[in-house]
Amino acid sequence: MTAPSQVLKIRRPDDWHVHLRDGDMLKTVVPYTSEIYGRAIVMPNLASPITTVDAAIAYRQRILDAVPAGHDFTPLMTCYLTDSLDADELERGFHEGVFTAAKLYPANATTNSSHGVTSVDAIMPVLERMEKLGMPLLVHGEVTHADVDIFDREARFIDTVMEPLRQRLTALKVVFEHITTKDAAQYVRDGNDYLAATITPQHLMFNRNDMLVGGIRPHLYCLPILKRNIHQQALRELVASGFTRAFLGTDSAPHSRHRKETSCGCAGCFNAPSALGSYAAVFEEMNALAHFEAFCSLNGPQFYGLPVNTGWVELVRDEQQIPENIALADDSLVPFLAGETVRWSVKK
């Protein structure tokens, strides 16, 4: 019997979906991402959404100012799509290398999404321009109608929004972000080379029982919400198969402790400190470590048409405890897996 590997050496990974926030929170959380990842697709859903080239340039600079010396990190900026967005502004940002992609939030689907798109028809001229440019569309794939159960939002989105959109714009590059259901896993698997998906560590590791049985665990509450076990298993099987159009996107989404542990708590898991080791544990459990590097470091660049990072990262089998909290200026931040022992960690 072969002894389990003690070290995993992979090309430096990228995070294809992260929330870095702004202000003091940004300064606190950026180093957890910039230390490990070469690049990250930065979500534009600030309190004032990133909808212009100038706003994206200014936000990118604030991120870079928060990157510690010695970290080689490139934030990849995204444009927040709204019903009134100017297609020329989007194209200018793409040509100038400011915008890597554009993000579609259905209105009120998640944090700071009230400015989001009310219907795909409202932004069709923008999407048609993106198709011509070869600019990726990043999609939070949930419908938000009041009559749709929260656990059914993703599956309904596929039928009513995603598939009709892709039938209309057959050459539009689409990333179905943070997929959570067997429906989405099958849909992406059956899709063509213009369709890819990101998957978070929490949706691979946990299901809704973990969040709700024996007490509500607010630090597992995120959107899209954790689903039942059969969906978790479908996601695990997708990544374990070596499917090349699925890649790492943590959806790391920090909120201060008092905004999570409250009667009406915010959605999001701050998983940046432990995400890479969490993914490694899942791939190991699935006997799929042969596909781990591709998921973390190769599949994303291939879909985006970007070069693979030149550096390397090592993970070591070394049990470490995740801190209970991380200090903020006037509060604290509870990380994903707080207080728990993890078996894979990034070698410093």
Swiss-Prot record:
Q: Which organism is it from?
A: Salmonella schwarzengrund (strain CVM19633)
Q: Which domain of life is it from?
A: Bacteria
Give the binding site residues for Zn(2+) 1. 17, 19, 103, 251
- What does the record note on quaternary structure? Homodimer.
- Report the EC number(s), separated by commas if there are several: 3.5.2.3
The question of whether Zinc is a record keyword is answered with: yes
Role played: Catalyzes the reversible cyclization of carbamoyl aspartate to dihydroorotate.
Write the signal peptide boundaries.
Answer: none
Q: Which gene encodes it?
A: pyrC
* Molecular function GO terms recorded: dihydroorotase activity; zinc ion binding
Cellular component aspect of the GO annotation? cytosol
| UniProt protein name | Dihydroorotase
Q: What is the lineage of its organism?
A: Bacteria, Pseudomonadati, Pseudomonadota, Gammaproteobacteria, Enterobacterales
CDD domains, sorted = DHOase (cd01294)
What residues bind Zn(2+) 2, as annotated? 103, 140, 178
Report keywords, A-Z: Hydrolase, Metal-binding, Pyrimidine biosynthesis, Zinc
